[in-house]
């Protein structure tokens, strides 16, 4: 596809917004109520998972973390670490080099479930390399003629690629054959977060640079669509705003200016009927929560004057909720706390050292 088609499509009980006709969105925030609450009243089923710290498992302060089928995976420079569901270090993928099964860099990775097999896929300058998640053996290379910045596996016939080529996105198959291309390259509206793709039961989102638009893979229709995925947020950043500010202020000043003048959608997660959105503007940061899949939302300030009192990890700024943006779990909400923020605390019978690996916190929202 050489041009972008803007369509609206029925998605179960939701109707998406097209580029020009703004109907109901996948997430509609018509009714938002500001509240105050204790953190323990907001989340439950809390599980703390300190990731084991040994010389061969050291992680950077910021790492992409995935919890899939009771195992935890974490990116660390040129390696992918693997831990069990208690945080015990199991092993790592480490194939840096020039050989046919090696990679010279890791732009992104994903944990891919193919039938009964679990694989680690890594994208780099040569394409996407596949490895067995059990023994880290090399399974093959998907060669691509375009640079792969980020990717998300959907099926053998559908791999979403974010690229710096002529188009921003494309859809290819397991053989590297490009099926469709989307969005002419638009630097102002491309982000490069650790967790670039967000998966829900119905589809996969790639938020376009903190705006109200996303490239959306609809699992029902098996196609990519450009949609306004959220509605009801006043002064929300749009792609047009983003582009205009880039042209006006330039590459360096642009992010600060749009963060000051608009409401930016930092990230979101949806588990079952429960959704959490994190918003940032010149006035501060908020989390919006929905527990029933309707248009009734609860709004809580998390900075600078939080309306959530942290009674679970006393003394820790509730802004740590935002670490959800770098991690995801297949069965719960999850966040990642740098060890230095919990130094001296007793977690699962262990005193946390400032130099330890991050501590994962899995949780559900209260009913």
Place the predicted regions along the sequence by residue:
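A short helix->beta-strand "capping" segment at the edge of beta-propeller domains
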Residues: 33-59
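C-terminal motif of bacterial Sec signal peptides marking the signal peptidase cleavage site
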Residues: 15-16
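Conserved blade-ending motifs and adjacent loop-strand segments that build the rim/top face
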Residues: 230-240, 294-328, 343
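Short coil/turn segments at the loop-to-beta-strand junctions that recur within blades
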Residues: 55, 94-102, 143-149, 184-190, ...
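Blade-loop segments of beta-propeller domains
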Residues: 52-56, 89-116
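Repeated scaffold domains used in trafficking and secretory/extracellular systems
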Residues: 60-64, 103-110, 146-154, 189-197, ...
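Short beta-strand elements that form the blades of beta-propeller/WD-repeat-like
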Residues: 71-76, 110, 117-123, 157-164, ...
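Loop/turn-rich, solvent-exposed surfaces of beta-rich toroidal or solenoidal domains
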Residues: 257-306
